[in-house]
Swiss-Prot record:
Transmembrane segments: none
Gene Ontology CC, one term: cytoplasm
Pfam families per the UniProt record, alphabetical: Pept_tRNA_hydro (PF01195)
Function: Hydrolyzes ribosome-free peptidyl-tRNAs (with 1 or more amino acids incorporated), which drop off the ribosome during protein synthesis, or as a result of ribosome stalling. Catalyzes the release of premature peptidyl moieties from peptidyl-tRNA molecules trapped in stalled 50S ribosomal subunits, and thus maintains levels of free tRNAs and 50S ribosomes.
UniProt source species: Rickettsia bellii (strain OSU 85-389)
This protein's name: Peptidyl-tRNA hydrolase
Gene Ontology MF term list: peptidyl-tRNA hydrolase activity; tRNA binding
Keyword Transmembrane attributed: no
EC nos: 3.1.1.29
Keywords: Cytoplasm, Hydrolase, RNA-binding, tRNA-binding
Swiss-Prot/TrEMBL GO biological process terms: protein quality control for misfolded or incompletely synthesized proteins; rescue of stalled ribosome
Catalysed conversion reaction: an N-acyl-L-alpha-aminoacyl-tRNA + H2O = an N-acyl-L-amino acid + a tRNA + H(+)
Family: Belongs to the PTH family.
C-alpha cells in the first residue's frame, strides 16, 4: 500500500496558484490510474484509490488548507496503517527554480507550512517530490507570491515538470527510487 499526498489549498480561488502545484501534479498522476477523487470528511480530504500490480494506491488532497495538512495525513495514515517509507508528499518549493524537481527522503521543511504541519504530527522521514515554483521578484511577499496564479508562460513550464513526474511515477511504484530521482534532474 502506498499513500501519495498532493499539498495545496481547497477552493476554486486557489486552483491554479503556485502553492497548489502539489494538487495539480497529484490529479495528473491519479488520472493515469483511472481513478477520481471524492470527499471523505472523516479524513479531512479528497481521496482516490486505485491498484497497480496488486499494490493499493491512495491519493490524497487535504481539504484542511495548507497549514493544517498534517491533520488529514495522520487520519489517512492511521486508518490504513501506512508506514512512513510508503508515504510520498508532492509540494511546491520556492527554493527551486520554476519547473525544477527534486526527490528526497526526510529532512527539513524549508519553511513550507504544509510540511511543518505534517512533520509536527508524523515525523519527517517520508518521501518528498519538490516542484520548483521560484522565488518572488523584487520585494513581493512570499505568501502573496505562492497564493497567486501562474502566468501562462510559467504554467507551461510547471506542466512540463508535472508531466515528467507523471511519466516516471511507475519507477516509484517499482521501488526504483534512485532511478526516479535521477530522471528528475
Amino acid at each position: 500500500m502506498m499513500l501519495i499526498i498532493g499539498l495545496g489549498n481547497p477552493g476554486k480561488e486557489y486552483e491554479h496558484t503556485r502553492h497548489n502545484i502539489g494538487f495539480i501534479a497529484l490529479e495528473n498522476i491519479a488520472k493515469q490510474y483511472e481513478t477520481s477523487f471524492s470527499v471523505k470528511k472523516k479524513f479531512h480530504c479528497e481521496i482516490a484509490e486505485s491498484t497497480n500490480n496488486g499494490q493499493k494506491l491512495i491519493f490524497v488532497k487535504p481539504t484542511t488548507y495548507m497549514n493544517l495538512s498534517g491533520k488529514s495525513v495522520i487520519a489517512v495514515k492511521t486508518y490504513y496503517n501506512i508506514p512512513l517509507e510508503k508515504i510520498f508528499v508532492i509540494h511546491d518549493d520556492i527554493d527551486l527554480e520554476l519547473g525544477k524537481i527534486k526527490f528526497k527522503t526526510g529532512g527539513g521543511n524549508g519553511g513550507h507550512n504544509g510540511l511543518k504541519s505534517i512533520d509536527g504530527i508524523i515525523e519527517n522521514n517520508y518521501h518528498r517530490i519538490r516542484i520548483g515554483v521560484g522565488r518572488p521578484q523584487n520585494s513581493q511577499d512570499v505568501a502573496d507570491y505562492v497564493l497567486n496564479n501562474f502566468s501562462k508562460t510559467e504554467y507551461v513550464i510547471a506542466e512540463q515538470a508535472i508531466d515528467k513526474i507523471t511519466d516516471n511515477f511507475n519507477l516509484i511504484l517499482e521501488n526504483k527510487l534512485e532511478e526516479f530521482k535521477s530522471k528528475m534532474v
